[in-house]
Amino acid sequence: VPTETVYGIGADATNNWAVKKIFHIKNRPFNNPIICHFENLEKVYEHAELNSTALKLAKAFWPGPLTLILKKRKVSKISPFVSNNIDMKGCRIPNHPIAIKILKNLNRPIAAPSANISTKLSSTSIEHMDNKLKKKRIYR
């Protein structure tokens, strides 16, 4: 999935199996949290608490490449695997039409790490993606 920064892979952030699959595909340790992408600020509110500072930053810089670390709401259905069972989440609203279209169609947050094998460079184009990652199946 393209974003305004790097290419990413994504899965339903509320689906434990899908989130664990991302860690497996990327060879990423579970103690390395994954950012969640949201369609809009209202969707962020459903899953995270924003204090006055976070709200000012969100309104000033979202959509865009700013990631805010926010406290997860108790009612949130985001998988605990996204952040290694910690109640804080990296949240972002991307500023790319394809990413937003996917988020609208799914109507859920997406666990969205960069499209690379863990510890390797992030890809800024589809051509630079690691071939090992391109060959891995994410879906069931």
What are these regions (language model features)?
Residues 2-140:
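Active-site-adjacent structural elements in enzyme catalytic cores
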